[in-house]
Amino acid sequence: MGKGAAKYGFKSGVFPTTRSILKSPTTKQTDIINKVKSPKPKGVLGIGYAKGVKHPKGSHRLSPKVNFIDVDNLIAKTVAEPQSIKSSNGSAQKVRLQKAELRRKFLIEAFRKEEARLLHKHEYLQKRTKELEKAKELELEKLNKEKSSDLTIMTLDKMMSQPLLRNRSPEESELLKLKRNYNRSLLNFQAHKKKLNELLNLYHVANEFIVTESQLLKKIDKVFNDETEEFTDAYDVTSNFTQFGNRKLLLSGNTTLQTQINNAIMGSLSNEKFFDISLVDSYLNKDLKNISNKIDSKLNPTSNGAGNNGNNNNTTNL
């Protein structure tokens, strides 16, 4: 590590800053050309030395003339093609010619890329400067508008000429559209679900419709014989789905209690003794079977334990 490593943070192998391969501006950099050709300011803000005032030693009284480089002329002078090519009989001569051609090619590419980089840098700086100026103008305009609104009162004509409501932004319009689509879909779903429940109730009640003469005679006999059993053949939710309770209990005074139990377990809000769409969905998803198995395991733990003990005894005897 050399003596000058301290200024690089005591790090070895640090490369110096890169320098441009073009020492002067090119002829395509119009911004520098216009700046050089523009008249110099005079007066207090002028540049230079007044008459009778000597300039400091080692400096120039007049600014040196800026020389612009034409990249094509520079390439023609520095990387010109060889005028005469010697016979390349030997392999060493061929290698030297190939290396010289590669050096010329790489130097030409370096000149072109450096000129393109300078032009791109100038365009980016101009674009960035315009953006910053525009943002500053908008900020100043906003501040001035707030100040003027604080110190003045809106006139009646100005108030009537402006809209009563603010227009929605594109984000707000998109959000409102999504909300409307959601509400429309939800209403359609609820209406469809209501129709399915009504159709299912009609299916249950249709079992009690009298459509034949034999059914009519049978029903008349039941009425005149003072039978106390309710005339319904509806599908029993408790016996067919949940497997706890029986039909007589469902048709007795405990119907409301059984319905509340079913609603609490199945998440249904229906107060009828017929099963609704939610129970059908639970049955298709096998949720009812899982609940029934859990209830059986809770109600009959002794039988399971006895069965296990019997199996253990049989294994021991064997």
Swiss-Prot record:
Compartments, record wording: Mitochondrion
The GO cellular component terms are: mitochondrial inner membrane; mitochondrial small ribosomal subunit; mitochondrion
Q: A Gene Ontology biological process annotation?
A: mitochondrial translation
**Ranges of Low complexity compositional bias?**
300-318
Q: Which CDD domains match?
A: mS26_PET12
Q: Which UniProt keywords apply?
A: Mitochondrion, Ribonucleoprotein, Ribosomal protein
Taken from the UniProt record, the cysteine pairs bridged by disulfide bonds within this chain are: none
One GO molecular-function annotation for this sequence?
structural constituent of ribosome
Question: Principal place where this protein is found?
Answer: mitochondrion
Stretch list, region Disordered: 295-318
- Role according to the record: Component of the mitochondrial ribosome (mitoribosome), a dedicated translation machinery responsible for the synthesis of mitochondrial genome-encoded proteins, including at least some of the essential transmembrane subunits of the mitochondrial respiratory chain. The mitoribosomes are attached to the mitochondrial inner membrane and translation products are cotranslationally integrated into the membrane.
Please give the family membership noted in the entry. Belongs to the mitochondrion-specific ribosomal protein mS26 family.
- Describe its partners and assembly state: Component of the mitochondrial small ribosomal subunit (mt-SSU). Mature yeast 74S mitochondrial ribosomes consist of a small (37S) and a large (54S) subunit. The 37S small subunit contains a 15S ribosomal RNA (15S mt-rRNA) and 34 different proteins. The 54S large subunit contains a 21S rRNA (21S mt-rRNA) and 46 different proteins.
Instruction: Quote additional remarks.
Output: Present with 2010 molecules/cell in log phase SD medium.
Record protein name field: Small ribosomal subunit protein mS26
